[in-house]
Amino acid sequence: MAGHRKLGLPTDQRRAMLRNLVTSLLKHGKIETTETRAKETRSIAEKMITLGKRGDLHARRQVLSYVQEELVVKNLFDNVAPKYTERNGGYTRIIKKGPRRGDGAEIVILELV
């Protein structure tokens, strides 16, 4: 049964962390994080961009319920989503950076294509 990754966090903390990562990705265009967090974030971010492509009021409200900053939502609907009108999915890429010095966790850069 496919589901989501637990990421070693309780549910509320995991949801909060993923909301922050998605907001940062849409705000800055790229983020640096661990590989498993990036894979989980990518899934959610792609859904947000697909909602942005729809462009109606309901989609905007759905994104607003997840993304924390209104300016990021406005930017998503006005600038980011129109770039991907011809593309069906695959809005992000993961670039491996190497292991983290402290614990050896695989660090990657997650960026919008």
Swiss-Prot record:
Pfam families per UniProt: Ribosomal_L17
Record's keyword annotation contains Metal-binding: no
A GO molecular-function descriptor: structural constituent of ribosome
GO CC term, one of those recorded: cytosolic large ribosomal subunit
Subunit: Part of the 50S ribosomal subunit. Contacts protein L32.
Protein family per UniProt: Belongs to the bacterial ribosomal protein bL17 family.
Record-given protein name: Large ribosomal subunit protein bL17
Gene that this polypeptide is encoded by: rplQ
